[in-house]
């Protein structure tokens, strides 16, 4: 892979344009008789394009998405629970959608068609993959304000108590230390009983606060009430709106309309999923080069234009939106906050013990640092990666029920991984990150895609046409590497030819020879 690190930006752009051509091979140009054709021509005129395929950033779903299913008067048949159990996917039914429901969503954007091309001709071609994170940790898991304020106070209190115990013990005379040890030995069973009772209460508290997710059937810890957490989400929403108030795209912008219709279609196709129909989903598109997206627990969807410029087609964007919606539906924010509170409580106990046992403050500070890093890398980050993998699985199923090409989901992460290699970013171990690595996410989705394809069939989605985008991506990468090797070989050959040019050799004439000639003359 050392070849990749020396690539010039022009060659990187050429590869990325080749990746974007994958979308062109699967794009659909509607015939003149299609009712969608005038709307598409209006969008192309808005962007100064002649055909749909000129915009490489976001493309149309060929005969599989919202409008074609509406115009063809197709309905999805129901998925029985028995069929769902055989597939091993979501155990609810495919939603029966009438044309009137979809047309109502289409009427809201009569000025500009919903599935519009969402990038301008000036969209940057290079993907800055390293900064991409779906549902950043701070954005996806708001922590209750009271605990945010009390968290440093709790740590300070634990340090003061532990250090006070140590100073008290060091100040005791030797005879009193022996008396205290004898008292502990005499009452060891009472102390053991007290610790056992505390442990039993902790276990009872833990299991009484477990809830089963209605979507996945997985048990999860919830210490924060849903209503309380929704209130905190509203407060966080106000903070984000204040921050992005000058960067939000207007509602008539084609990129905003595209995302809005995709979110509407995803939620309508999955409104039988617990938590989707009860939530009011509101879209906000932030004009920022950051490659990011997140959904608050109260249904506020934030997506950045940098992400719109990074996806190859609408299929990839549909999966990413499904991933973020899955975070909100599964209650990952409340679950992560609950785990943080539990670990903070246990951490206070260990922190008090560290400051009480360590003989010096410097050793206590070192022990506190080790304890925080162990908590972070053994509990926090692995749990975050688990939640991300679960959101990938459920998001893929949501996209499958919306009749997107689920095969494009793994292609997106392959693109991100290859883009990082092209830019020369170091590959960090996965255990250092809150998210799975791009390569592992692509492999995980590849294992889930067969089930998602079966779910598409059960939901009566149109069959997928054209070659597999994963195969096209691999061929594009292979061709790009071959071209790069040829270019490097040509540069090497030219350099060798230049070095092999005959040079006039200047011979040094000895000084004695010159003197002899002059003497003889």
UniProtKB/Swiss-Prot annotation:
- Mutation effect (residue 324 to Q): Abolished protease activity and ability to cleave OPA1. Abolished autocatalytic processing
List the catalytic residues.
324
Region spans: Cardiolipin-binding = 144-163
Any one cellular-component term (Gene Ontology)? mitochondrial inner membrane
Binding site residues for Zn(2+): 323, 327, 388
- Give me the segments passing through the membrane: 192-212
- Give the record's membrane topology: Single-pass membrane protein
**Keyword Protease belongs to the record:** yes
Per the record, ranges on the Mitochondrial matrix side are 140-191
| Pfam families according to UniProt | Peptidase_M48 (PF01435)
Q: Which EC number(s) does UniProt give? A: 3.4.24.-
Q: What superkingdom does the record give?
A: Eukaryota
UniProt keyword terms in alphabetical order: Autocatalytic cleavage, Disulfide bond, Hydrolase, Lipid-binding, Membrane, Metal-binding, Metalloprotease, Mitochondrion, Mitochondrion inner membrane, Protease, Transit peptide, Transmembrane, Transmembrane helix, Zinc, Zymogen
| Positions of the propeptide removed during maturation | 80-139
Point out the transit peptide region.
Answer: 1-79
Q: What does this protein do?
A: Metalloprotease that is part of the quality control system in the inner membrane of mitochondria. Activated in response to various mitochondrial stress, leading to the proteolytic cleavage of target proteins, such as OPA1, UQCC3 and DELE1. Involved in the fusion of the mitochondrial inner membranes by mediating cleavage of OPA1 at S1 position, generating the soluble OPA1 (S-OPA1), which cooperates with the membrane form (L-OPA1) to coordinate the fusion of mitochondrial inner membranes.
Q: Relay the domain remarks.
A: The stress-sensor region regulates proteolysis and activation.
The name this protein carries in UniProt is Metalloendopeptidase OMA1, mitochondrial
Recorded source organism is Mus musculus (Mouse)
- Supply the gene name: Oma1
